C-alpha cells in the first residue's frame, strides 16, 4: 500500500516511457527476487549467491528484507533523478536485473516464491 501510494503521489512528472521502463525494471527486480528465493531452498545442490551484500547463503528473511528495501529505494531514486538521468538509470537497472534473471534461469533456478 505504501509503495502504491508513493507511486501515485510522485510520478506525475515522469514521461510515459519512464513509467513503462520503471514497471519493466520492477518486473526484472521481482523476477530476480523470485529466482533467488528458489536458490535459498536449494543450497544443498551447490547454489551460492554472488551478491556481496547478501553473502553466499542468505536466509529467506534477509533476502526478502533486501529486495523490499531495494524496491522502495529504487522508486525514490528513480523519482529523485530527472530527465535523461532517470532514463539512463532505468535502462541500466532493467538490463542488469534482466541479466541476473537470465543467468539464474540458465543455471536452473526457477521463478517461484
Identify the residue ranges that each predicted region occupies.
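Bacterial N-terminal signal peptides
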Residues: 1-5
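Hydrophobic alpha-helical membrane segments
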Residues: 7-113
Amino acid at each position: 500500500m505504501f509503495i502504491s501510494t508513493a507511486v501515485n503521489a510522485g510520478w506525475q512528472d515522469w514521461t510515459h516511457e519512464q513509467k513503462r521502463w520503471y514497471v519493466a525494471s520492477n518486473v526484472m527486480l521481482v523476477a530476480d527476487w523470485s529466482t533467488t528465493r528458489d536458490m535459498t531452498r536449494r543450497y544443498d545442490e551447490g547454489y551460492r549467491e554472488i551478491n556481496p551484500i547478501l553473502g553466499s547463503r542468505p536466509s529467506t528473511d534477509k533476502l526478502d528484507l533486501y529486495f523490499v528495501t531495494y524496491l522502495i529505494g529504487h522508486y525514490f531514486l528513480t523519482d529523485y533523478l530527472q530527465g535523461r538521468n532517470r532514463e539512463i538509470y532505468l535502462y541500466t537497472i532493467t538490463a542488469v536485473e534482466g541479466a541476473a534473471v537470465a543467468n539464474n534461469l540458465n543455471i536452473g533456478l526457477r521463478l517461484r516464491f
